[in-house]
Amino acid sequence: MRHGHPRLLPGLLMLLLLPLGAAAQKTSGCARWCPPKSTCVNATTCRCSPGFSSLSGEIFSSPLESCDDIDECGPPPLVSCGRLADCQNTEGSYHCMCSPGYALASGATTFMNESENTCRDVDECQLKPRVCKSRGICTNTKGSYTCKCPPGFELNLGDLNLCTDVNECTSGQNPCHNSTHCLNNIGGYECRCRPGWKPVPGSPNGPKSTVCEDVDECSSGKHTCHYSTVCINTVGSYKCRCRRGWKPKPRFQDRQLNTTCEVPAEMSFPTWTPPPGIKSQRLSNFFERVQELHRDFKPALAQETIQDLIQEVDELLEIPGDLEALPHSEQHCVATNLLVGLEGVLRNVSQAMPNGPWTFNASAGTDLSLEVQEEGYRNVTLSQNLAKMMLKWDVVHKSGDSGPSVVGLLSTPGMGKLLAEAPLVLEPEKQAVLHGAPKGLLQGVSSVLLSDVISVFMSNKVTQKLSSPVTFIFSHHSATHEPKLKVFCVFWEHSQDECGHWSTRGCTVVDSGDTSTTCQCTHLSSFAVLMAHYDVQEEDLVLPVITYVGLGLSLLCLLLAALTFLLCKAIQNTSTSLHLQLLICLFLAHLLFLMAIDRTEIKVLCSIIAGALHYLYLASFTWMLLEGLHLFLTARNLMVVNYSSVSMLMKKLMYPVGYGVPTLIVAISAASRSHLYGTRTRCWLNPEERFIWSFLGPVCTIFSVNLGFFLMTLWILKSKLSSLNSDVSTLQNTRMLTFKAIAQLFILGCTWCLGILQVGPAAHVMAYLFTIINSLQGVFIFLVYCLLSQQVREEYGKWFKGIRKTRAESEKYTLSSRAMSDVNKPMMVN
């Protein structure tokens, strides 16, 4: 191995020997062909410089030789640099260098041999803190380093020291919900709600878990729609649409965010004409003024038109003039015309009003509260001095309608003058409530108007059966709570055939105090609070006694008759089978009536009892019909009663008809109007909506058919009697059939007709007749079918004889036993 300073020595010697060489050439000669990197030895040989060699060695004599660099680093290596170092050949020499990532402890860059090797790892991360660019994280390794990128970054393939941002939004590496959109940022991303959306309750706006929902700008008031338009929410946005009946202004388009609309000139004041046949100068003057308002109406002046109309109505009712001289019936017609006309005009003209609540007042007390609003999900309350109305907005806004809706409450205190002595029509159920006792008889009703008359109108014209009831709170004159006085919530009902009357249909009193009454109604019209005075006949205490005693006897007789037909085998045939089914149905119906007719505490139970009574009584009447049919067929086939087709026909028909027909009627009634089973005072059919005819209709039909059977039976028997021979048995059978036909008509329906005839002056008498005869129906049946039947009497005789014989044998056995006992006593003593 060579050292740094010794390498300089050959060079210096060469410089010193040059003059000598030149002299020697001159003297001894030197080869002129020596190649580069060599020196002349003599005239025939050359020597390669240190670090170079030729093929022949260090000294050569051929002019074709050249001196080439000796590669000390090999292969094979001529020197050893040691571990973590690399040999670097140089022209004429070499040096050792630490491998990349390593350096000498001295700080030098080269060394000559392994003994000088002090290479150790270089920490590039400390040496060059910014070796990893753009947020890269440097990690030192043996002899090198690596750059790692934080989340949201990745290494640049062109420069492994450079970290570049990952765009998660375009790469599909984000889990954002579809209700959000991805926003890329340096090193990450956000899930932000889309425009027009908002985070759902409990969800933040930005993190990966963000979930959004549409913002209803319309209901939240976060829209910029002009008052002439209606806000319509869309997914992520909204539109502004012209109100119903309006049109966009010039240079504007409908359904845009900046839409502005105007009222079209064709929105008209509806035609309103006076009632026909009414002669009144005061009314004529009023309608002349109405025609002026109609002629001058412009949608832009809707507010002024409504105010003028309210004032005109107010003045008419304050000073009615010659209207007061009209008969009450004609005054009622005028009131109906005013109420209906006002409702129509105000409904139409209000469509031109801007959104918002409005109030109109007149000097004499006529007031109008109006609300024009978009569709909402809230309660609406309109108030005046003496009345308040509360309803749900979905009642006002008809499904499918566009634009805002209108609801108005009009109070007309002066309308009571025209409605004086107006008739009051009470529902049957309200009549029962009036007199408080279901057995009392209502004699007469007179009414007094306590409150102002209010009218309700809305843009939705379908108001006959509202989805939810409307609540009214009336403040009125003090009501006297005495017997024979009752407060009612009423509305003004009119038709084409009559001018109108007060009615309670669909309205109920929720609460009533001395000066305030709360009502609920399922329809809209003109409403008021009436106090009705009535006379009630005192309840007759004798009728319940007759009912319970008579039904008790009937139950006993029905039970005896049923046991007779069930246990007596000798008399059983088709006729007795019909009798037995009739007796069972009547027995169960009377028993249920006695035990449960007043069980009204639990409404569901009361409805079930009413349905059971409905079924049992209808089944009784159906079996009565089959009795009449069988009697008619028997009379027609008098001579072959037991061998004709009558028996077979009745056996096939009686059970399906007897129990199937009433089942069908009750099933249809319960499916259509189940809520009408049971009243407040009785577990029977509610007379509302003519539901009672689901019982009376079949009863009347059966009675009519039985009457026909009776007449035809009499006609057949009459012809039989005229053609009979002297056969005594046939004559007796025919007479018995004639008697049964007469009794059948009386039992099978005539008594029930008396119940329908309980009206007018004879109602009290009819009530007694119906109660007595109907409650003793079981007694009549036992008398006709058992006691007056020779076969049954004979069977009863056999039973009694058997009972006496059994009793006699029992007594004989007892006496014999005693005699034997007396004989044995002395023997036992002995």
Swiss-Prot record:
Domain of life: Eukaryota
GO molecular function: calcium ion binding; chondroitin sulfate binding; G protein-coupled receptor activity
Ranges facing Cytoplasmic side: 562-576, 625-651, 712-744, 789-830
Record flagged with keyword Transmembrane helix: yes
Listed InterPro entries: EGF-like_Ca-bd_dom, EGF-like_dom, EGF-type_Asp/Asn_hydroxyl_site, EGF_Ca-bd_CS, GAIN_B, GAIN_dom_sf, GPCR_2-like_7TM, GPCR_2_ADGRE2_ADGRE5
Keywords assigned by UniProt, alphabetized: Autocatalytic cleavage, Calcium, Cell adhesion, Cell membrane, Cell projection, Disulfide bond, EGF-like domain, Glycoprotein, Inflammatory response, Membrane, Repeat, Signal, Transmembrane, Transmembrane helix
Membrane topology listed for this record: Multi-pass membrane protein
Coiled-coil segments: none
Positions annotated as glycosylated: N42, N113, N178, N258, N348, N361, N379
Site label Cleavage, positions: L524, S525
Keyword hit for Repeat: yes
GO cellular component terms, semicolon-separated: leading edge membrane; plasma membrane; ruffle membrane
Record's comment on post-translational modification: Autoproteolytically cleaved into 2 subunits, an extracellular alpha subunit and a seven-transmembrane beta subunit.
GO BP, sorted A to Z: adenylate cyclase-activating G protein-coupled receptor signaling pathway; cell adhesion; cell migration; cell surface receptor signaling pathway; granulocyte chemotaxis; inflammatory response
Segments crossing the lipid bilayer: 541-561, 577-597, 604-624, 652-672, 691-711, 745-765, 768-788
Ranges in the topological domain labelled Extracellular: 23-540, 598-603, 673-690, 766-767
Annotated compartments: Cell membrane; Cell projection, Ruffle membrane
Signal sequence annotation: 1-22
CDD domains on file: EGF_CA
Family matches, as PROSITE patterns: ASX_HYDROXYL, EGF_3, EGF_CA, G_PROTEIN_RECEP_F2_2, G_PROTEIN_RECEP_F2_4, GAIN_B
Function of the protein: Cell surface receptor that binds to the chondroitin sulfate moiety of glycosaminoglycan chains and promotes cell attachment. Promotes granulocyte chemotaxis, degranulation and adhesion. In macrophages, promotes the release of inflammatory cytokines, including IL8 and TNF. Signals probably through G-proteins.
Family listed: Belongs to the G-protein coupled receptor 2 family. Adhesion G-protein coupled receptor (ADGR) subfamily.
Entry-linked PANTHER family: ADHESION G PROTEIN-COUPLED RECEPTOR E2, ADHESION G-PROTEIN COUPLED RECEPTOR
Protein name (record): Adhesion G protein-coupled receptor E2
Name of the gene encoding the protein in the UniProt record: ADGRE2
